[in-house]
Amino acid sequence: KAIAEMPDFKGYLSDLGGPSANMYQMGGKDTALCRRCKRPSCIHPKVCPNLNTDHQPLLEIYHAVDSLPGIKKSFIGSGVRYDLLLHQSKDAKTNQSTKEYTRELITRHVSGRLKVAPEHTSDKVLYLMRKPPFEQFYEFKRIFDKINKEAGLRQQIIPYFISSHPGCTEEDMAELAVITKKLDFHLEQVQDFTPTPMTVSTEAWYTGVHPYTLEPVFSAKTPREKLAQRMFFFWYKPEERKAIINELRKIGRND
């Protein structure tokens, strides 16, 4: 309401959400189970059956915002967890709210581009990141494209990827380049791994082993190793072509 009343506000909310944009009011159904739980994550490696994944409260927020005087459109720029949109719970009402949320998100709350974060194509690397398998991104993109077609829209899905994450090798990045080329993605939203305190990834990067399994984990650390991974994002740039071909030959990817 305060934003809508600002004199220079034009009626468009650019990002109604934030990190984990579709986890509003989600929590354990039985909190007694949560108190005894030893899992470090409610959504990895799979969504916990005790997690309430009902999207109805969030839909009600969207409807309330859109009904305010002065609000023309509200958009979700990024932060959507598509693994939660694909999750099938045992509650039919919850599944229906998720389906309704997905359609409403795509048809009413995308400003032309929806940014999502598959982060990698290698399931081995994704597991270290505590992210869902890449096949879930394929499925979400299929749904996104289908709903766009049905609604007569021409919106884009913009994936975010990361290089040099612990566990990621040049071979993994070469495969990422092949997959994103097949998907016709000219990647823009990319980043090199940056260690941040209190994360499993940083523990693995610093120690060279996975903190839970104590298995060795490779991490690209030198400038040469990092650049060798990063360049695979940009297979479509002519200036990167020669270096990429040379690197592919080094790792035995003559295809």
Residue ranges and their predicted role:
Residues V116, P159, T180, V190, ...:
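Hydrophobic, well-ordered secondary-structure elements that form the walls
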Residues M198-D255:
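Radical SAM enzyme core and accessory elements
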Residues L58, Y62, T98-T102, L187, ...:
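Alpha-helix initiation and N-capping motif
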